[in-house]
């Protein structure tokens, strides 16, 4: 099979038309035979263990089960590549085509798509401008709906009728002297399909815009919601009636495999059971329609087909959940793609990527805000290509093999080269779940011992991280553009404000707040140290470090700078014989000469507050 490579910018998910679904699965063989429709519920033959033709694992539709071998065995080996066997109709190709070739089931009666009926909000109910309960009553054959009131005076468009009401109207229509004409009533998904087909989206949108101008409150909000849905349908070119399915795609068989266990039994994907229910009910309905069975029996079979398709698309969304062995609910298509273990989050978004690592985070109190501590063991693995390149460029080694051996030996030269490599090379840190853009930020790595990533405590609120065992992923931006982008846009020190609220997201919390409080707190129960005077801040800190002073003890320390303590009270004044004065305030003592010039000033503080203030001043100065 040729390797297909195609560049694309985005993936668009939209409604598929019945023609598009058939196009996915239909192929024309060289003999003119059209294949693709799955008509039988069988999977594999219990005697030959080969897939049944036109069944859920059919080789004619999905491709051969074995590489380069047709179903009947007439053609084997790669030399027959591309030949379609005239006996069994199977194309001789690789078996991996069974991973992407699709089939389809043509339904004997339309059914609604449960996502659009029972989703929140219900797009079907919004488009039809009907309550969801009424739409459900129609879909599940509990009520009739008026498709065309004709000239009946008591009927209106989209009016719901019970069985008895419809029978009375029917009798009235078929009376010999009846003048009623053009009355049309429907039930089930066919009626919903007709109502959706009758919608003129452009006219509805224009009318809604007029109504919105003249309405307010709850009614206006409802009209805007409906207009938004209609505008989306117009913009995407999707037709509302496509929400009612007439064809169901059958996903490739290798994505819903059937494998033989040791005891001879088979394990199969739940999807096969759900598809089998749909095919059985669809075939039975087609047979009942052929033999012109009574309407009540046909209607019941249509309802059962609707429920089977609902279970296939989203088991348990409406009605009873379909269960398999051991009363375990069967996994439907929705269950496979939704949630943490689903296809998107587990296999597409959650892929393992190269140049990435993962480890537990611990607090790094000595780091600057734009730095993170990266374990040496992790750094040498992540930056290995860069290290090897530099080793060869500096002619320390001659080739890649020698460089790798040097790394494996933990040669001391390696760490010097690694230091050079990581200098100025930012790394990205990500903590799942990444709920906003600050869930991934860039940091300058600092090599640390141990096996844990060190993180600055200030960036924790942005990541919603704490240090009780949280893990974070590290990614290395490779290209110059990626590195520049990481440095300019994603560096932690450039993301101080929350993009959502505009308020600071880098705020001190937990240990930092507690530390600041502890340093600046008072302790009135301590012995009185207020008779101690110190010449400067350094003397106070030295006395504390030598154990002569507690952290929270009040002392007097000389400070000749300006003090703004907000104290407006009158000081207690003591005048000396030489004319000098001592002015005693609550938190400072000022000595002046006879001319009122200040000689000295002492302020009342604690060693803790001095340490706190010095730390702040040093940080501001740097």
From Swiss-Prot:
Cofactor binding mode and count: Binds 1 Mg(2+) ion per subunit. Binds 1 Zn(2+) ion per subunit.
Annotated gene: rpoC1
Phylogenetic lineage: Bacteria, Bacillati, Cyanobacteriota, Cyanophyceae, Acaryochloridales
Family recorded in the similarity comment: Belongs to the RNA polymerase beta' chain family. RpoC1 subfamily.
CDD domains for this protein: RNAP_beta'_N
PANTHER family: DNA-DIRECTED RNA POLYMERASE (PTHR19376), DNA-DIRECTED RNA POLYMERASE SUBUNIT BETA (PTHR19376:SF54)
Reaction catalysis annotation: RNA(n) + a ribonucleoside 5'-triphosphate = RNA(n+1) + diphosphate
Name of the protein described by the UniProt record: DNA-directed RNA polymerase subunit gamma
Binding residues for Mg(2+): 466, 468, 470
Organism the protein comes from: Thermosynechococcus vestitus (strain NIES-2133 / IAM M-273 / BP-1)
Top-rank EC class of the record's enzyme: transferase
